[in-house]
Structures are given as C-alpha cells and as structure tokens.
Amino acid sequence: MKIYLRFVWILIIILNFLLNLFITTNGVIIVNAFKKSLIVAASFASLSLFNSATAELVYKPLEQPVEPAKPDLKIESVNEKFAEKYPNQYNSWRSTANGDGENIIYADEENPRLIVLWGGYAFAKEYNAPRGHFYAVTDVRNILRTGAPKTANDGPQAMACWTCKGPDVPRLIAEWGEKDYFNAKWAKGGPEIVNSIGCADCHDTTSKDFAEGKPALRIARPHVLRALDALEKATAEKDKAEGRPHNNLSFNTAARTEKRAEICANCHVEYYFAGDIKQVTFPWDNGQTVDDIEKYYDDIGFTDWTHSLSKAPMLKAQHPDFEIWSLGMHGKNGVTCVDCHMPKVQGADGKVYTDHQIQNPFEAFDSTCANCHDQSKEKLRDIVTSRKKEVKDVMGRLEDQVVKAHFEAKEAWDAGATKKEMEAALMDIRHAQWRWDYTAASHGGHMHAPEVVLRVLASGLDKVADARTKLAVILTKHGVKTPVQIPDISTADKAWKVMGIDIEKERKAKEEFLKTVVPQWEQQAREKGLLVDPPAQK
C-alpha cells in the first residue's frame, strides 16, 4: 500500500514538472485544472486502499481478576516506624528530598509542544520532570492534572492515580479489596495515602527475614503479580519458539536477579486503567516491546482519550522504564536497577548497607559504573551525554512532525473530510505519538537502552510520515492549500491559549484545594496514626 501511494505521488510530481516545462502561459488555466484532476484522482485511489486496511476502534475490555480484601495481610505503611532499626537505610531514603529534587522542572513550559501533543487530555495542563520518591504524594496532590476536588466523590481522576505513590496503597487494597479500591475517585484516597514511596512498597516488613536485616523483597500489589505472570507466559513462549534461554519472570518463583528488577516494576512500567472500575493493568500479554503493547491496545480497541485537534484515538504512555531496560543491553546482561541506582555503601558506623538515596549512578561512580566499565568517569559521562543528545534530537524531530499532523488533521476536518476518509491517517497519528511517548515518558531510556529508544523513534518518524502523506491527499481533495499554517506555540502560555486551556483558572482552583482540602486530609491521617513526624536527626 505504501509503495502504491508513493508511486502515485512520484507520478504526479513528474507530470507537474513536464506540464510546467512544456505548456505555454496561455495554457495555465488548463494546466492547473489538469493538475487538480490528477491529484483528486490519486486521492480517491489511495484513500480507497487506506480505508480498506483500517477498522474503527471499539473498546472491548478484557475481564480482569479482582482480589478480595485480605484483612490478615498486614502492611505497615508508616516509613518512620523503621527509622530506629534501620537508620542508614531510612536516612538515605529521606535524602531523596535533597539535591535536584528540591526544584520542580516544568517540562511543558520548557517544551510547549507537549501541550499540543496532549491536547484534550489532563497532561496538557501540567507535566513536570520526575523528582525523588520522597515527593511522590506531594507531587500528585499539587499537579493540575488531579484537579481540585472538594469531596471524596468529586474530581476528574480515578483512585488508580494513587497506585504508585506509596505503601498506603497496598495497605488499602488489602483492607478494601481491589474492587472497592479502584472503583473510587482519587479524592477518596486523600486522607489515607499520605506516606510516600517507602519501605513496605518493596519489603515484607512484617516478616522474620526483614526483622533479621534481610531484604525480604515483596510485591504486595496484586495487579503487578498478575502482570509478571502474564509476561512470564508471553516471553517463555517467544524464547522457546526462537531457541533462546529463558529466565523465569513470575515474581514468587523468580531468581534473585529478576526479583531485584521486578520490585521496581511496581511502578516504573507502562499501564492503563481498565474497564469501568479503572483498574490498573499492565498491557504485557504479548510482551513488552512498543509493537507488542500497541497490538494489545489495538486488539481491545483501547483509547486513553480523543485528541482535541485531530480527533485521533490516542494512547498515553506512562513510564515504561522496566520494559525499555529489559529490552536493552543492561537488562540483557542482568544489570539491574539496584546495581546502578542503589549501590552498597559504608555508613558512618562502619556497616555496609544498600543506599536508598536513589540517584544518578555517576554520583556514586566507583560503586556503580566502575564495577563493569573500565572507562574513566569523564569518558563514560561523555558517551552517555552524546547518546542523550542523539535521542533528544530525534525525539524533537518526531514531536515536531506529530504536532503538524494534529493541526493538519484539524484542517481536514474543518474542510469537510469524512470519518471514513480520516480513519487511516488518525491511526497513523495514534501509532506515531505512541512511539514518541513510549520513549519520552521513560526515565533515562538514553542510558538504559539507547539502541531500543532510537529504533522506536525511527519507527515513529515512519508512522508520522505515513500520516502526513495521507493527510496531504485529503487536504488536496478538499481544496485546502498546503502547507497548513501552524499557530504560534513558542511559549507555554501561547500553546495553552491555542489549545483552549484557561491555565489561570486551573491554578487558582488548585491553590484553593491545597489551602483548604489537603490540610483536612492530613489532619484525618494524623488522627488515624497514618502520618507521623520524622525522627530528629542524630
């Protein structure tokens, strides 16, 4: 189909050249009419092929298991209760509040194209660079995306938006059961989810092993265990078919190396909110590649939202760090998240412990990178910086092309294009932006697996080229002059205005929410003993 389309357009270009070369000025009107008839004819031919290849998305939710309440499962969510027994681990964990994390980086203000790419979705209101685990609860409260709810049943977001934010989440799932947990508004969790990502997210803190100072790694979120079981099934079948060695990925039976990485898959993964109850689900039934997950979503007809400009059925990637890592050189060589971000260090008391100040490996180079690499810190940093620049450059090109495609699609709709005409181009926009977001939403993909990220971005450029070629045909058919003029989106304020977002209204509502509602949440949490003051530093 692609070859046919390109052949048609090459033919048109050649005919245009010949006509302009040989027809006299007196024949301009005839030439223009002939050129237009050629383009329209090509349009009908190519569009008939496009539309025969694409079906409309209809969401068919996959039925998900729902775990009942488990009142006997005790999860201690207050991180401060472990400070006395494990001071080195606690104090290093608390240090994630320091350094770069103290400052918020407003990514959408640095790159206003994001506001267009997420047009019609809450991410267009505010998107910030990630900070340390210490800030997880604070940041989800503060971000404009969660709105300004006034009651437990109010607001735009689902309870699922809390699911990665701290150990109160598995505690609540155990107390309420998955159905009652997920089938609620985000605001209902406000007085309950007050402890940021910490001890009980990764460790069985009530176990004998933990009491003896052993890691006692545990995943207490049922949906994560189900996802790893599904991934084990998918990858085992692929590895067997392709004659590759296979490592068991089901958490409860996995080896230590796999478990050390899978703990981070509690949160650093791609997921979506499934069904009416908005249940957090990992789309791993086919595997973890960008194509595997795209096929999963396309097969069930899932759409995160409909884009406000193009009307494309969009997908929003979350943060597929575990996926990209596992597909790249570090994952394939068994170098886990803990090896690079949580090295063994010696405390002031002489004890060796795992550093819980999760940070850039270059900050502890001798304990991380130097364990495997013989290059100097400066040499290795130069390599990583160069890879980051390559990724950013290609990512920027893809962003620019997808932004143009959204505006071109809007112009086509405004000119009278039909749903049938637009269907194939919109699917290409969906697939192109999905590839951009799969890479852009990952944390450190340029470091974890640069070859994977660049390959995904390159395929995204192919997809958006297909989209814009199809849109050019549609625009020409409907008499729209090209190139389509793109509004000024050079600043965030200009982009918000173009996209119809009243950012000041959103900010004022959030300010009032933080001033009136959040203090009530914290007071209720203190009364329940869920929120306590940190111990004094010795």
From Swiss-Prot:
Residues annotated to bind heme: 161, 164-165
EC assignment: 1.7.2.2
Similarity comment: Belongs to the cytochrome c-552 family.
Binding site for heme c 3: 133, 264, 267-268
Note describing how the cofactor binds: Binds 1 Ca(2+) ion per monomer.
Signal peptide segment: 1-55
Pathway: Nitrogen metabolism; nitrate reduction (assimilation)
Protein name: Cytochrome c-552
Example GO BP: anaerobic electron transport chain
Binding-site residues for Ca(2+), renumbered to this chain: 270-271, 316, 318
Role noted for this protein: Catalyzes the reduction of nitrite to ammonia, consuming six electrons in the process.
Uppermost EC category: oxidoreductase
Gene Ontology molecular-function annotations: calcium ion binding; heme binding; iron ion binding; nitrite reductase (cytochrome, ammonia-forming) activity
Binding site for heme c 2: 199, 202-203, 356
Subcellular location(s) per record: Periplasm
Keywords: Calcium, Electron transport, Heme, Iron, Metal-binding, Oxidoreductase, Periplasm, Signal, Transport
Catalysed reactions, semicolon-separated: 6 Fe(III)-[cytochrome c] + NH4(+) + 2 H2O = 6 Fe(II)-[cytochrome c] + nitrite + 8 H(+)
Entries under CDD domains matching the protein: NrfA-like (cd00548)
Binding positions (substrate): 271, 319
InterPro entries for this protein: Cyt_c552, Cyt_c_NO2Rdtase_formate-dep, Multihaem_cyt_sf
Cofactors demanded by this protein: Ca(2+); heme c
Binding site for heme c 5: 330, 369, 372-373
GO cellular component term of the entry, any: outer membrane-bounded periplasmic space
